[in-house]
């Protein structure tokens, strides 16, 4: 079996994209799974294709596992870690990074602008719901 996962684009405008991810785990988890394909996001009104995204806000509810959001690169770089542990139960919150310009891609060797996700400490029926607000960079 495999984790039951969904990805949904809630908004995809000229400057901002909002995406939502869910997972109900069967205990197998996810490892560096592409969640945001930057090249699949809508082009700007001027016809430019986005090259990178900056994480402006994160809303999350994580139960029983940890979730790492990663900048895809030759060796992925962790952008944020959400959740806690099975002992912590559900951990939810909102992180707003707009006051300082957001969490920017580190441009590590081999970066491509995509955002990946890795879970750890997952067991059967652990779960997450994550919403990202991304600013597109052209």
What do these predicted regions represent?
Residues 101-127:
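Noncatalytic modules at the cell exterior or secretory-pathway interfaces
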Residues 15, 54, 63, 109-111:
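Repetitive beta-strand solenoid architecture
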Residues 78-102:
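An anionic, turn-rich surface loop/hairpin at beta-sheet edges
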Residues 64-84:
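Short, surface-exposed beta-strand/strand-loop-strand elements in extracellular ectodomains
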Residues 3-13, 119-138:
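C-terminal interaction-tip segments
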Residues 24-33, 66-68, 77, 120-130:
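Short, surface-exposed beta-strand/loop "edge" segments at domain boundaries and coil↔beta transitions
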Residues 1-47:
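Solvent-exposed, flexible loop/coil segments flanking beta-strands in beta-rich domains
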Residues 34-71:
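Beta-rich globular "head" domains
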